[in-house]
UniProtKB/Swiss-Prot annotation:
One term under GO cellular component: plasma membrane
SUPFAM superfamilies: Cyclophilin-like
One Gene Ontology term from the biological process aspect of the record: protein folding
Documented activity regulation: Inhibited by cyclosporin A (CsA).
Matching InterPro entries: Cyclophilin-like_dom_sf, Cyclophilin-type_PPIase_CS, Cyclophilin-type_PPIase_dom
Function: PPIase that catalyzes the cis-trans isomerization of proline imidic peptide bonds in oligopeptides and may therefore assist protein folding. Component of a putative tumor-recognition complex involved in the function of NK cells.
Glycyl lysine isopeptide (Lys-Gly) (interchain with G-Cter in SUMO2), cross-linked positions: K323, K576, K579, K637, K654, K664, K1208, K1249
Record's compositionally biased regions (Low complexity): 195-213, 532-546, 554-565, 682-726, 736-749, 799-809, 948-958, 1189-1199, 1322-1346, 1380-1401
Residue numbers of Phosphoserine PTMs: S379, S401, S416, S611, S646, S880, S882, S884, S900, S1139, S1148, S1195
UniProt source species: Mus musculus (Mouse)
Domain PPIase cyclophilin-type, residue spans: 10-175
Gene from which the chain derives: Nktr
Composition bias type Acidic residues, residue spans: 903-913
Name used for this protein in its record: NK-tumor recognition protein
Length: 1453
């Protein structure tokens, strides 16, 4: 028939419900009558229902399910819509009519097939000549108009399977009447004759062939329909083969007629090319048998060559389809797969097709697919880079293909952040489902990595995996950081937060991250976080150190800080070892730290792969060193510092001396107060690492400040895990001195201070973490009380410091809990800040606490509904503080995590808002959260609130800091803040487990220095050591309890010892200089605090012991808390509560919460640590980062095993801390522990350096592609950009895991506070709060907070934060903040002197907020760089919002 006689039909196409035009086809009914008739009838729909499919034989409503750019667009599957269905009007398949026409030009209509003689209803329109399809696919028509529609379809984005994301549908189709009449009739006649002859012959001949083949093919099709992928793949091959055969046919035919026809068509095309290119309708009859190999063979590209040979392709494709056909994801395709055409032979011909599995996939897709595949391992490891950590590890990448690359950021997601890290799991699943192939592969890989992390994480995060990871995870999550969506509450929240950070930011996410983050990411702004965080962490560390020192002794801190701070700011700013150098010992160590920061920043990415993931390392494993020369450097420096640490360890007394030298102003205070401050800082650093989150959360105004300073180092540590952690750990672990050095680098001043504090307060640190919890709580209660009193203001500041720690701890905890709810927490914190401010303004503790509880509960609801109950209890506790004591204790049991959360959330938020508000109003609302948190918070509060509040808080912190300070110093040597936190967290976990074996593990506490390093080791060590440490830790806890008990009697002794009760004395002595008129009352409240066990570490132990029978485990845990969490951090009451809850957590999704409750027990320090640890573990799976945190993190992660390991670690930590049981014991223990610690520190120093390094290594080495750390790191990296501080938090998260509590919350906040680290402005604001606390601890917290902030600012945010100062309560804060930021020396001192509570907190907040805004801009840049800017920024905003004020809170919300 003439070209004009040929029938024409049309398709009206719509893309995503929008009509795009009409494609007109001309069918070569003269050449392929049967195929043309099939197509025409399918266009007209006149044939009724198909025999095979039972669907109406009509193209109307069918889709173009396969689009290969520069090749073809395929459609016609009216039954399945995915290339696996469709049938001809003849029933099933019909034979290839002929291959006269060739695929020699574009816009030919050819039949898709699954092999020889498998033509059904599927057709394709070539968009380029496809000679490889000649002899495989039957060309039966061409497009005469609608070319632009075809091109539009061809240019649609498609997935890996070449399936367009858009819905390309034939909304109407039909046959043109004129030709329809003629051609259709002719075709019908011809087709009946030809087609039916063909059909009958097709059916007769093919009856056997086609019948068997058709039936087989039908069955195959049915199978394929069932197994669409396999079928699709096969279908592709067939189609390709069909196309190939059709092309040859068509070419042949087109030669005669085709060319004239083509000229016509070309004319039409030129005319229509602008209009519509109609798909040539492929008649099933005309569709030649497709060489199956070509079309079907994904692996067997030879089929393409078999253009004319249809038989071979038929046979081969089927076989090869089944054998070789592998989906791009590597899945074997069963059946022949969907009908597909081979991609053009050029570059994508059979060979490429083989490679691609479906050559039809455009090269860019292939590349992307390969990239994704290649990335999959990294996706576990490098989530922070491409995706939000929070988003599920696989989810991220997987969703990245699904454009969920920003898996909220979702492996974090981790997550939002919440879902990122933890979403990482949730999203993993979702995304996996979405991207079954990629997701399965990636999800499996990523999820595996992630699960490895999330094994840790999931215990923590599993509940939170709901959101995630993780994500970040996050997040991860786990985003992070960290575990924003983790264990039911803590885990979930932590994981969620992290995931938020990671996913939401971080997911997020979350990282995480959750957190995601965590894990948020806790896991994304890690690199940036590392860079920024590292710089910030260093700055912060220095600031923290300085701040702590300053806080500790405004005067001493100031000058010391001044020298350190300025240097540190510079150093921190530069983030260079050189900066480190300016700080004397600090400098070298700082150099280490800085190097570590750099290493951390750099190392986290590279070294992680160097050796087995740190989590896999044994405690003494060395890959760290090869991985990190900087680790070695840090080791060398740490070794320098180790002696210092040894000195510190050996001499908590020396630490006092060092404190004197380092913080002479605060010497008495320094020993305990400084130790407390340091410890606070450490605790805050540990907790502050956690507090980096915390700090970053700035929710714990002081704690977070301190925590933050430390946390920043931790952040830095996490950022450059070893560095930061080494910073912190080196700060804390490498003998206080190394700590100091590290701290000098990151928290040089902080380090020195902390080192001293640690040396004084290794136990103090341990204590302090506890004590930070306790002290925080004590300070909180003191703070509340003291605040209410005239010394209340000072105490408030001091309490603030403690509270900050507590807040930090709480916040960290909260953050950990809030990992999923990081944002929630940030909001809650922002609300709390508002409420805290309002309450502080209104001074309604209960109210504040209630809102805090409420807010916190919202966060914690996600995190811990049980904790929410606990929170409500905690809120009630807070509200009824007298009842609160027992209630809190009980609540703590039920609400350990909630208490912790509350403490952290409230303390954190309270601290944030309270510090800001304390500083602003110096009201007890922030404190009440802490004190109210304390079981004996009321009793302690009453005692404490007058003087005890500050005094004991500080004393408690100091004592606990001493208790922990020395062990922690030793621990510091080991893991310092990070290690401390991790250890504390672990110790808490272990405290739970090891409360029974407290005493023995003291040496192991030493041993935990390497475990610091054993970020990796920690997990394994945790598992192995946990058992060992558990007894030791329990014994230590018992010892500590005894020490606490003794410390209560021997307040002085315990003071030195680091016991809360003695710490109140010593704290009173030491922290009285810090201006806490409540130190002696602190001593009183210390016992009260013992009542308030949560409030005060020794009191914690006492309290637990008081509640011993009922709280036996609580006592154990509180003991552990006392030991691990003696610092107010845990607020042992909380610890008590934590015990059950911690255990509960351990068991439940609150595994994260368990660590948090363990952390709650050691909450400020260990609790946050643990939570951070959990987060960290989740986020980073950062045992190293969580070495202490690992205990926490690991505990949550490996709820039992890891917790045991964590507790072992913590046992070790506790053991380290434990030596500081009494001042005498502290000295002796310190000496012994120092010696042991020295030995261990020295032996471990390399590891201590590596501890930080290991932390980093844990951060890095430990990072497995799917590990939490990896997620956290990714989150950190991702967060690093978007939320440098958050990133730091995430990065810090591992480090901060050391600061388990703060860090954990900061993990929570590491996603949240990783955001909060970008909330570090928030943290800065919390710093302000910290400063507020430091105001009482006034100088100490606030000043050093200031300084720390300044240093922090100095580093990256010096301006940022400085701007922040100006920006937010820029009024005076601006001046001071700027002063602080501007004159690091001055503002170290200046800030120190400029310690007005409100100022400080304003300043901090200003810094925080401004930093939030500026750093949100700037850090945000970092953080944003991390890619979590939104989450981070949000977190920061939130953080600083709730830090800042209700308005800011609102803003955050």
């Amino acid at each position: 028939m003439g070209a004009q006689d040929r029938p024409q039909c049309h398709f009206d196409i719509e893309i995503n419900r929008e009509p795009v035009g009409r494609i007109m086809f001309q069918l070569f009914s003269d050449i392929c009558p049967k195929t043309c008739k099939n197509f025409l009838c399918l266009c007209s729909g006149e044939k009724g229902l198909g025999k095979t499919t039972g669907k109406k034989l009509c193209y109307k409503g069918s889709t173009f399910h396969r689009v290969v750019k520069n090749f073809m667009i395929q459609g016609g599957d009216f039954s399945e819509g995915n290339g696996k269905g469709g049938e001809s009007i003849y029933g099933g398949y019909f034979k290839d009519e002929n291959f006269i026409l060739k695929h020699d030009r574009a816009f030919l209509l050819s039949m898709a097939n699954r092999g020889k003689h498998t033509n059904g209803s599927q057709f394709f329109i070539t968009t380029k000549p496809a000679p490889h399809l000649d002899g495989v696919h039957v060309v039966f028509g061409l497009v005469i108009s609608g070319f632009e529609v075809i091109e539009q379809i061809e240019n649609l984005k498609t997935d890996a399977a070449s399936r367009p994301y858009a819905d390309v549908r034939v909304i109407d189709c039909g046959v043109l009447a004129t030709k329809l009449t003629k051609d259709v009739f002719e075709k019908k006649r011809k087709k009946p004759t030809c087609s039916e002859g063909s059909d009958s012959s097709s059916r007769s001949s093919s009856s056997s062939e086609s019948s068997s083949e058709s039936e087989v093919e039908r069955e195959t099709i049915r199978r394929r329909r069932h197994k669409r992928r396999p079928k699709v793949r096969h279908a592709k091959k067939r189609r390709k083969e069909m196309s190939s055969s059709e092309e040859p046919r068509r070419k042949r035919t087109v030669s005669p007629e085709g060319y004239s026809e083509r000229s016509d068509v070309n004319e039409k095309r030129s005319v229509d090319s602008n209009t519509k290119r109609e798909k040539p309708v492929v008649r099933p009859e005309e569709i030649p048998p497709v060489p199956e190999n070509r079309f079907l063979l994904r692996r067997d590209m030879p089929a393409i060559t078999v253009e004319p040979e249809q038989n071979i392709p038929d046979v081969a494709p089927v076989v090869s389809d089944q054998k070789p056909s592998v989906s791009k994801s590597g899945r074997k395709i069963k059946g022949r797969g969907t009908i597909r055409y081979h991609t053009p032979p050029r570059s994508r011909s059979h060979s490429e097709s083989k490679d691609d599995d479906s050559s039809e996939t455009p090269p860019h897709w292939k590349e992307e697919m390969q990239r994704l595949r290649a990335y999959r391992p990294p996706s576990g490891e490098k989530w922070s880079k491409g995706d939000k950590l929070s988003d599920p590890c696989s989810s991220r990448w997987d969703e990245r293909s699904l454009s969920q690359r920003s898996r909220s950021w979702s492996y974090n997601g981790y997550y939002s952040d919440l879902s990122t890290a933890r979403h990482s799991d949730g999203h993993h699943k979702k995304h996996r489902k979405e991207k079954k192939f990629k997701h399965k592969k990636k999800a499996k890989k990523q999820k595996h990595c992630r699960r490895h992390r999330q094994t840790k994480k999931r215990r923590i995060v599993m509940p939170d995996l709901e959101p995630s990871r993780s994500p970040t995870h996050r997040m991860k999550s786990s985003c992070v950081r960290e575990r924003r969506s983790r264990a039911s509450s803590s885990s979930s929240h932590h994981s969620s937060k992290r995931d938020w950070s990671k996913s939401d930011q971080d997911d997020g996410s979350a990282s995480t991250h959750s957190s995601r983050d965590s894990y948020r990411s806790k896991s994304h702004s890690r690199s940036d976080s590392r860079g920024s965080s590292r710089s910030r962490a260093v700055s912060k560390s220095s600031s923290r150190s300085l701040n702590r020192s300053k806080s500790r002794s405004s005067s001493r801190s100031g000058p010391r800080r001044t020298s350190i701070s300025p240097k540190k700011p510079a150093q921190l700013s530069e983030n260079k070892p050189v900066k480190t150098e300016p700080l004397r010992p600090s400098v070298p160590q700082n150099g280490n730290v800085l190097v570590q920061p750099v290493a951390a920043e750099n190392i986290p990415v590279i070294p992680l792969s160097d050796s087995p993931p740190p989590s896999r390392w044994k405690p003494g494993q060395k890959p760290w060193k090869p991985s990190y020369e900087r680790i070695q450097e840090m080791k060398a420096k740490t070794t320098h510092l180790l002696p210092v640490q040894s000195t510190y360890s050996l001499t908590n007394i020396k630490a006092t001396v060092s404190s004197s030298s380092y913080h002479k102003r605060e010497k008495p205070s320094e020993s305990d107060g400084s130790a407390y401050s340091k410890y606070s800082d450490r605790s805050s650093g540990s907790s502050g690492r956690s507090g980096s989150k915390s700090s970053r959360s700035r929710s714990s105004s002081r704690s977070y400040t301190r925590s933050r300073s430390r946390s920043l180092p931790t952040s830095r540590s996490l950022s450059r895990s070893p560095s930061s952690r080494s910073h912190s750990p080196n700060k804390y672990s490498d003998g206080s001195q190394h700590s100091r050095s590290s701290s000098y680098t990151s928290v040089s001043s902080d380090d020195g201070r902390r080192a001293m504090f640690r040396s004084n307060r290794k136990k103090s640190v341990t204590s302090h973490k506890r004590h930070r919890s306790n002290s925080e709580k004590t300070l909180h209660s003191k703070y509340v009380r003291g605040r209410e009193k005239s010394s209340r203001h000072r105490k408030y500041s001091e309490s603030r410091s403690s509270l900050d720690y507590s807040s930090d701890s709480d916040q960290s905890h909260v953050q950990v809990y809030s990992a999923p709810e990081k944002e929630k927490q940030g909001k809650v914190e922002a609300l709390n800040d508002k409420q805290g401010k309002g309450r502080e303004e209104g001074k309604p503790k209960p109210e504040w606490e209630c809102p805090r509880s409420k807010k916190r509960t919202p966060k914690d609801h996600s995190r811990d509904d049980s904790v929410s109950k606990g929170k409500n209890c905690a809120g009630s506790k807070w509200d009824s503080e007298s009842n609160s004591e027992q209630d809190v204790t009980k609540s703590r049991k039920s609400d350990p995590r909630r208490g912790s959360e509350k403490e952290e959330g409230e303390a954190s938020s309270d601290s944030e808002s309270e510090v800001g508000q304390s500083h602003i109003k110096a009201k007890p609302p922030a404190k009440p959260p802490t004190s109210t948190f304390l079981p004996g918070s009321d009793g302690a509060w009453k005692s404490r609130r007058p003087q005890s509040s500050a005094s004991e808080s500080e004393s408690s912190c100091s004592n606990l800091g001493n208790i922990r300070g020395e062990p922690q110093k030793q621990k510091h040597s080991k893991d310092d803040l990070k290690g401390d936190h991790t250890k504390r967290a672990r110790e808490k976990s272990k405290a739970k487990k090891d409360k029974k074996h407290k005493a023995p593990k003291r040496k192991q506490a030493f041993h935990w220095q390497p475990p610091l390093e054993f970020g990796d080791d920690e997990e394994e060590e945790m598992n192995g050591k946990q058992v060992t440490q558990d007894p030791k830790e329990k014994r230590h806890v018992s010892e500590k309890c005894e020490a606490v008990k003794d410390g209560i009697p021997n307040v002085e002794k315990t003071c030195d010892e680091g016991s809360s009760p003695s710490k109140p004395k010593k704290g009173t002595l030491e922290q009285d200089p810090l201006a806490e008129g409540g130190h002696d009352p602190s001593s009183c409240p210390a016992p009260l605090k013992v009542e308030d066990n949560t409030a005060s570490s020794p009191p914690s132990a006492q309290h637990l012991e008081e509640h011993g029978p009922g709280g036996g485990e609580d006592v154990l845990q509180t003991d552990d808390n006392m030991e691990i969490c003696t610092p107010d951090r845990t607020s042992p009451a909380k610890g008590e509560v934590v015990s059950p809850l911690a255990n509960h957590r351990l068991d439940s999704p609150e595994v994260n919460i368990i660590p948090e409750q363990d952390e709650c027990m050691a909450h400020p320090r260990a609790g946050g640590e643990q939570e951070s640890s959990m987060s960290e573990s989740k986020t980073l799976g950062e045992s190293g980062v969580k070495q202490d945190s690992s205990t926490s993190v690991t505990s949550p992660v490996e709820t039992s095993g890891k917790k045991e390991g964590a507790e072992k670690s913590q046992m070790n930590l506790t053991d380290k801390w434990k030596p500081l049981q009494g001042v005498g014991n502290l000295s002796v223990s310190t000496a012994t522990t120092s010696s042991a610690l020295d030995v261990k520190a020295l032996s471990t120093v390399p590891e201590v350096k590596p501890q930080g390094l290991r932390i980093e290594i844990k951060s890095k080495n430990k990072v497995r592609p799917g590990s939490l750390f990896d997620e956290v790191r990714k989150t950190a990296r991702l967060n690093r950009r978007p939320r440098n501080q958050e990133s730091s938090s995430d990065d810090q998260t591992p480090s901060r895991d050391g600061d388990s509590q703060s860090r954990s919350p900061h993990r929570s906040r590491s996603k949240s506070e990783t955001k909060s680290r970008h909330r570090t402005r928030s943290v800065s604001y919390s710093h302000s709060r910290s400063r507020s606390r430091s105001s009482t601890s006034s100088y100490r917290s606030r000043s050093y907070s200031r300084s720390r902030s300044r240093d922090w600012y100095s580093r990256g945010r010096t301006r940022s934060r400085s701007s922040s100062y100006g920006s937010f309560h820029s009024h005076r804060t601006s001046s001071r903040s700027r002063s602080r930021s501007s004159s690091y020396d001055l503002h170290s001192r200046s800030r120190s002197y400029t310690y007005d509570s409100y100022y400080s907190r304003s300043r901090s907040r200003s810094r925080s907020q401004r930093s939030d805004s500026y750093h949100r801009g700037r850090s945000y840049n970092r953080r944003s760089r991390s890619g979590r800017s939104y989450g981070s920024d949000s977190e920061s905003d939130r953080s600083y919002s709730h830090h800042r004020s209700p308005s800011e809170s609102s803003r955050y919300s």
